Amino acid sequence: MIHVEQTFEENLFTIKGQIAHERVDSAGDTVTRGVRVARGMPLWSERLELQGKADLVEFRPEGAYPVEYKLGRRAGIHADLQLCAQALCLEEMLGVAVPRGAIFYHGLHRRYEVVIDQLLRDTTTRAIEAVRGMLRSQRLPPAPNDARCPSCSLLNACLPSVIGEPARVRGLQGALFRPLALSQEDGDA
């Protein structure tokens, strides 16, 4: 919704995420325990037509190691896909392999290492292509209406409980697009 319909709303969770990212989002390089650390590093890939920003990249002796910061807890593959996209950008930009990275969960104060294997690379590439197709078509996928919805900042714009019920949608569409003359005959006006 953010990119297709230019809709964004703040809520407690988006604000907490901004606060959690304040330090890591301040662009710049430091050296920690002999390792160069780049914060807020711009990333891009001409091949994948991506551009973005890494929360943090550690330049270890064995190579670049992206670290993505997340507010909540580990759930699903979405953060892994984001981290992999960053690794793919780093590989293209630097001409080096990026075989692993990490996701730091702020609430848990813990890092989880992610292996950037071929399956994750292929899944990430397919996800990028699917998003690109959605942006081109300007059509959003159906709202999932699941346990994540009550915490989502876009809940009131998305209305998953309404959109997720086809009969209700048809009824609303019928009422919305009923000609005025028919409405007046029915005594609705």
Range-by-range predicted roles:
Residues 139-185:
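Cysteine-cluster motifs in flexible loop/terminal segments that predominantly coordinate metals
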Residues 11, 45, 76-77, 117, ...:
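Alpha-helix initiation/capping motif
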Residues 7, 127-130, 134, 175, ...:
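Residues that form generic nucleotide/phosphate-binding pockets
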Residues 1-6, 92-97, 160-166:
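Short helix-capping/linker segments at secondary-structure and domain boundaries
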Residues 44-52, 57-138, 142-145, 150-156:
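Nucleic-acid nuclease catalytic cores
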Residues 24-25, 31, 80, 92, ...:
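Metal-cofactor-dependent catalytic cores
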Residues 1-64, 73-74, 176, 188-189:
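Metal-dependent nuclease catalytic cores that hydrolyze phosphodiester bonds in DNA/RNA
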